[in-house]
């Protein structure tokens, strides 16, 4: 098998693979030119859970010669898919961490990141899309657009990632690609257009017809190249109709193809393969259209044409505009466009950290310049310089050592102390990449080691997990002394508790899951507060006048200084600002963070001797409490968007279950004998739902959920939470 890293240089590098004692392969490499970048594709494979992402990646690796055998995600052989390298992934049949690999297709090279589909691990998708140039959005041919599909679409838009769609599982009963395309248009507002037509339905799926080449592809046993044939006679008219739709859709957003049609008597003359392919490529990279391909990864149908589509339609690193910020001038950031040039100063982004067999692995995307083993580079965010000890390319859990990597490449470094999202550059360069979006945790629980012997490893594990995953948070509750971990959901936290046991040999005791409640006000609340303390010697004095009201920036808090003149000097204003930050960390109602509050200081008074920063910080706490109580305070709870799929026969039971949990069904979709409910349910009422749904549907129902919004709790729950907090404080003060 030809290595990606050696072969990508047009055959100039000498292939020299040898098994080292440490289990890492070594590759001798020569330098490369910018021409090699145009043959490179960095793609992510993303989808809703169970749409077949990992199965598709397994086929891609097999057809490109990267692996010798195909293993299924939940295969009877117990091996599991190549990209699911964690024991937990193989046991649960889901992807938990994004996994990187690379392969060769024709004369082109593809870096692939297979991402999780479960919403609890959405940060893995977020950071993958942050560093990729293109993506394959995998859709289930039966279920179509699902909740996590919508989330992934939002993430792709956030990072301006062009994508192609692969409608998978067309061999399953009820599969309909045209329904899925219509959902892409209506639910995701994508200009989706089919490039293929399937031959056969469901279990009779034989292949696909390529609308660009107007050739049929029939797929045999796994590993065999598709047989290219003329279009079957019973498909000719339908193919003609779909090709017309394809050309007209592209022409509507591409002036070049539109002009060709005018000049060449369209539709009497159709664009040739070269003209149409170029137009699809232009509009895909510009994110004006989303090409749709079809097949069944499990049945080995449509995978090779998808690989062709990745090369034909998705951008190379030098075709995507990458912006960095020049921080060389203090307090002034200037946007600069990076170039995929190996001779330019090195710029790379650490997008993922992982505890490997040989220490911490730092995954790096190289945007500009060349990174070599032994180089001294700068961590712009931390202001530290480091020497690169080792460079590797990842193939799932396996590592292959390399001496250098160039622009567009994805690699990993050993033994580098940094955080996810840090930018590394050449020593004389001060560029930094823009940060990635990190969602706020929605659930917490208390955790402690079962025995004191495990304390050291417990602390080490928490520290490592925080570095690896920005959505995994750890804090110490000052009142109870408990360690509280927070994350994106039950499964997210469950996985980390299990990893602590397996990887660090620490048995833990966990408390009941805690919901991420928030506190806020519903109207303006005024304050006129004086803090005065005299106990001999210098006293304390601070007076503050102002108000608190709802913030105009949604859930964000704001501090506004409206003091005219020097009624409160600037040094004390800073103390008030710090005091406000203290107040919003722990609200006065139930001790949860405060959100959506604008705190305004309009006047005040000082004493020439007794006023101090401490006095004003204490006064802020009193002023905030006074305004908060006057502002009709309330508690907000997280509402989850829940999608439940089930056979129609269990409809009544499941609806009753949603109602019991105080949920609201906002949409119902019927597909054959199956139903999908879209609901909005308070997170506090979703605990244990997985077990209940299995019981109600005889194991045939499934659900997914993601955070939607925070909204006011009911009056009943409001009073209950206040009472519980009061009891807790009483117990702690005994």
From Swiss-Prot:
<dbReference type="Pfam" id="PF00679">
    <property type="entry name" value="EFG_C"/>
</dbReference>
<dbReference type="Pfam" id="PF03144">
    <property type="entry name" value="GTP_EFTU_D2"/>
</dbReference>
<dbReference type="GO" id="GO:0003746">
    <property type="term" value="F:translation elongation factor activity"/>
</dbReference>
<comment type="pathway">
    <text>Protein biosynthesis; polypeptide chain elongation.</text>
</comment>
<dbReference type="InterPro" id="IPR035649">
    <property type="entry name" value="EFG_V"/>
</dbReference>
<dbReference type="InterPro" id="IPR047872">
    <property type="entry name" value="EFG_IV"/>
</dbReference>
<dbReference type="GO" id="GO:0003924">
    <property type="term" value="F:GTPase activity"/>
</dbReference>
<dbReference type="InterPro" id="IPR009000">
    <property type="entry name" value="Transl_B-barrel_sf"/>
</dbReference>
<keyword id="KW-0547">Nucleotide-binding</keyword>
<dbReference type="InterPro" id="IPR009022">
    <property type="entry name" value="EFG_III"/>
</dbReference>
<feature type="binding site">
    <location>
        <begin position="47"/>
        <end position="54"/>
    </location>
    <ligand>
        <name>GTP</name>
    </ligand>
</feature>
<keyword id="KW-0496">Mitochondrion</keyword>
<feature type="transit peptide" description="Mitochondrion">
    <location>
        <begin position="1"/>
        <end position="32"/>
    </location>
</feature>
<keyword id="KW-0378">Hydrolase</keyword>
<feature type="binding site">
    <location>
        <begin position="114"/>
        <end position="118"/>
    </location>
    <ligand>
        <name>GTP</name>
    </ligand>
</feature>
<keyword id="KW-0809">Transit peptide</keyword>
<dbReference type="GO" id="GO:0005525">
    <property type="term" value="F:GTP binding"/>
</dbReference>
<keyword id="KW-0342">GTP-binding</keyword>
<dbReference type="InterPro" id="IPR035647">
    <property type="entry name" value="EFG_III/V"/>
</dbReference>
<dbReference type="InterPro" id="IPR000795">
    <property type="entry name" value="T_Tr_GTP-bd_dom"/>
</dbReference>
<protein>
    <recommendedName>
        <fullName>Elongation factor G, mitochondrial</fullName>
        <ecNumber>3.6.5.-</ecNumber>
    </recommendedName>
</protein>
<dbReference type="Pfam" id="PF00009">
    <property type="entry name" value="GTP_EFTU"/>
</dbReference>
<keyword id="KW-0648">Protein biosynthesis</keyword>
<dbReference type="InterPro" id="IPR027417">
    <property type="entry name" value="P-loop_NTPase"/>
</dbReference>
<dbReference type="GO" id="GO:0032543">
    <property type="term" value="P:mitochondrial translation"/>
</dbReference>
<comment type="similarity">
    <text>Belongs to the TRAFAC class translation factor GTPase superfamily. Classic translation factor GTPase family. EF-G/EF-2 subfamily.</text>
</comment>
<keyword id="KW-0251">Elongation factor</keyword>
<dbReference type="Pfam" id="PF14492">
    <property type="entry name" value="EFG_III"/>
</dbReference>
<dbReference type="InterPro" id="IPR005517">
    <property type="entry name" value="Transl_elong_EFG/EF2_IV"/>
</dbReference>
<dbReference type="InterPro" id="IPR020568">
    <property type="entry name" value="Ribosomal_Su5_D2-typ_SF"/>
</dbReference>
<dbReference type="InterPro" id="IPR014721">
    <property type="entry name" value="Ribsml_uS5_D2-typ_fold_subgr"/>
</dbReference>
<feature type="domain" description="tr-type G">
    <location>
        <begin position="38"/>
        <end position="318"/>
    </location>
</feature>
<dbReference type="GO" id="GO:0005739">
    <property type="term" value="C:mitochondrion"/>
</dbReference>
<dbReference type="InterPro" id="IPR000640">
    <property type="entry name" value="EFG_V-like"/>
</dbReference>
<dbReference type="InterPro" id="IPR004540">
    <property type="entry name" value="Transl_elong_EFG/EF2"/>
</dbReference>
<dbReference type="InterPro" id="IPR031157">
    <property type="entry name" value="G_TR_CS"/>
</dbReference>
<feature type="binding site">
    <location>
        <begin position="168"/>
        <end position="171"/>
    </location>
    <ligand>
        <name>GTP</name>
    </ligand>
</feature>
<dbReference type="InterPro" id="IPR004161">
    <property type="entry name" value="EFTu-like_2"/>
</dbReference>
<dbReference type="InterPro" id="IPR005225">
    <property type="entry name" value="Small_GTP-bd"/>
</dbReference>
<dbReference type="GO" id="GO:0070125">
    <property type="term" value="P:mitochondrial translational elongation"/>
</dbReference>
<dbReference type="InterPro" id="IPR041095">
    <property type="entry name" value="EFG_II"/>
</dbReference>
<dbReference type="Pfam" id="PF03764">
    <property type="entry name" value="EFG_IV"/>
</dbReference>
């Amino acid at each position: 098998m030809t290595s990606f890293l050696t072969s990508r240089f047009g055959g100039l590098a000498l292939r020299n693979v040898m098994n080292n004692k440490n289990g890492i392969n070594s590759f001798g490499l020569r330098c490369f030119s910018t021409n090699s970048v145009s043959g490179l594709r960095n793609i992510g494979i993303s989808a809703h859970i169970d749409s077949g992402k990992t199965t598709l990646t397994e086929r891609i690796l097999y057809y490109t010669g990267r692996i010798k055998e195909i293993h299924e995600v939940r295969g009877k052989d117990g091996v599991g898919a190549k990209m699911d390298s964690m024991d937990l992934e193989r046991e649960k049949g889901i992807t938990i961490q994004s996994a990187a690999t690379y392969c060769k297709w024709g004369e082109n090279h593809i870096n692939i990141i297979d991402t999780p589909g479960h919403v609890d691990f959405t940060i893995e998708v977020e950071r993958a899309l942050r560093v990729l140039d293109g993506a394959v959005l995998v859709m289930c041919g039966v279920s179509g657009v699902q909740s996590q599909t919508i989330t992934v679409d939002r993430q792709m838009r956030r990072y301006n990632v062009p994508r192609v769609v692969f409608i998978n599982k067309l061999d399953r009963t009820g599969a309909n690609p045209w329904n899925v395309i219509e959902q892409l248009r209506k639910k995701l507002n994508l200009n989706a257009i089919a490039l293929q037509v399937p031959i056969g339905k469901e279990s009779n799926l034989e292949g696909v017809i390529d609308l660009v080449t107007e050739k049929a592809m029939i797929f045999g046993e796994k590993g065999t190249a598709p047989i290219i044939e003329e279009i079957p006679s019973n498909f000719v008219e339908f193919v003609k109709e779909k090709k017309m739709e394809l050309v007209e859709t592209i022409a509507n957003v591409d002036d070049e193809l539109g002009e060709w049609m005018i000049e060449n008597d369209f539709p009497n003359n159709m664009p040739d393969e070269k003209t149409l392919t170029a137009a699809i490529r232009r509009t895909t990279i510009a994110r004006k259209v989303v090409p749709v391909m079809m097949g069944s990864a499990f049945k080995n149908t449509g995978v090779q044409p998808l690989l062709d589509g990745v090369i034909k339609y998705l951008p190379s690193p030098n075709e995507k505009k990458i912006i960095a910020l020049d921080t060389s001038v203090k307090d002034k950031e200037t946007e600069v466009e990076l170039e995929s040039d190996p001779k330019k100063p090195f710029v790379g982004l650490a997008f993922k950290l992982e505890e490997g067999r040989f220490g911490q692995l730092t995954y790096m995307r190289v945007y500009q310049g060349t990174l070599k083993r032994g180089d001294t580079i700068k961590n712009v965010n931390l202001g530290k310089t480091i020497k690169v000890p080792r460079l590797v390319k990842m193939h799932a859990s396996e590592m292959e050592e390399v001496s250098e990597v160039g622009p567009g490449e994805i690699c990993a470094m050993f033994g580098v102390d940094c955080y996810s999202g840090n930018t590394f550059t050449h020593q004389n360069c001060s560029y930094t990449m823009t940060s990635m979006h990190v969602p706020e945790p929605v659930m917490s629980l208390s955790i402690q080691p079962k025995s004191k012997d495990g304390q050291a490893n417990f602390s080490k594990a928490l520290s490592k997990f925080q570095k690896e995953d920005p959505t995994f948070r750890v804090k110490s509750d000052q009142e109870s002394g408990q360690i509280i971990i927070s994350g994106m959901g039950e499964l997210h936290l469950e996985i980390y508790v299990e990893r602590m046991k397996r990887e660090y040999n620490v048995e833990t005791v966990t408390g009941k899951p805690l919901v991420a409640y928030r506190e806020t006000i519903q109207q303006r609340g005024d304050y006129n507060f004086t803090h005065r303390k005299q106990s001999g010697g210098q006293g304390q004095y601070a007076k503050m006048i102002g108000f608190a009201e709802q913030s105009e920036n949604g859930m964000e808090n704001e501090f506004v200084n409206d003091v005219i003149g020097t009624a409160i000097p600037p040094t004390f204003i800073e103390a008030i600002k710090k005091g406000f930050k203290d107040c919003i960390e722990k609200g006065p109602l139930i001790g949860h963070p405060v959100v959506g509050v604008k705190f305004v200081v309009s006047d005040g008074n000082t004493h020439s001797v007794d006023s101090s920063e401490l006095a004003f910080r204490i006064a802020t706490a009193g002023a905030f409490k006074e305004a908060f109580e006057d502002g009709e305070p309330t508690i907000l709870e997280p509402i989850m968007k829940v999608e439940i799929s089930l056979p129609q026969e269990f409809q009544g039971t499941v609806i009753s279950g949603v109602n019991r949990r105080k949920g609201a069904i906002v949409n119902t979709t019927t597909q054959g004998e199956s139903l999908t409910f879209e609901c909005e349910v308070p997170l506090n009422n979703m605990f244990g739902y997985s077990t209940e749904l299995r019981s109600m549907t005889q194991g045939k129902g499934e659900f997914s959920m993601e955070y939607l919004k925070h909204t006011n709790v009911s009056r009943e729950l409001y009073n209950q939470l206040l009472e519980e907090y009061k009891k807790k404080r009483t117990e702690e003060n005994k």
